[in-house]
Amino acid sequence: MSRIHNIAVACMMMLSGFATMEGQTGDRQTAAQKYIDIKMKEEPFKSGLVGVLAVTAKGDTIAEFNSSRKLIPASNTKLISTGLAIRGLGPSFRFSTRLGYSGYISNGTLHGDLYIIGGGDPTIASGDRMTVKTDSLFAKWTRALRVAGIRKIHGHVIGDGRFFDGPIENDTWSYNDLGTDYGTGGNGLCFNRNIQTFSVSPTTVEGKVNAEVTYPATPWIEFRNCAVTARPGTGDNLYQFNTDLAPVAELRGSLAIDKGQKKESFSNKFGALTCAWEFAKYLEKLGINVTESPADIDPYDNIRYTEA
């Protein structure tokens, strides 16, 4: 790959610190314990397996219930990993997303490719209130291009999501979780949390479910719809199966005929390419022509070009 010139640091986000609980009074501990004791006698906790252990930063127990029982921690591990990240990275840490280019600039035209180089920021176009809105972020990137003298791109916009090593999901995850919005995984350049929303609706029993992409658009992905409409009362059993190895996704399962039209969220394994696609569209709307289709880079440093 040819040398890439840095343009600017384009997007940053601060990891804010957690406020730690200091020593609680005995009365507060008793109140917390009483609350837990009451709740554990109610459903759904009463018939389930539950363990609670809450302690202060000094190690004093605030509340406890079945604290010695061995349970699968599930998403509680996010508290530990987040706390370790904040402690290790520090309060001044910022994620950075950089712009760069290959080739040369002549008379306002970049004769080469523009790169969006991800730094692991999970918030790009996520819609979170704490983050920069997508249009504001793209406007900032566009200003960086203009400062660099770029008014046209005779080449590709390429999303580079290679900041992290390895696959974007853990190989121990359940197969039917990989296509869900909570099984999307993360890479160095995410977009919209690497989630894609669909509008789905039933038709007739045993007929194919209607399914259309709403956001973000990924016209380079081949979508296969094998989902069917099921009897009333059978619920929503739609699953999408996909991989970052190929731009193919298949919708399977069923949707009850009494469910009506609804929104579904599935994983998007091409976050970097989606980011490049959306930014290229944004540039075109501003009159900054991009002559070639967007692309991304696979884990083996090969540029993958779209045909859409």
Predicted segment positions?
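Bacterial Sec-dependent N-terminal signal peptides
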Residues: 1-29
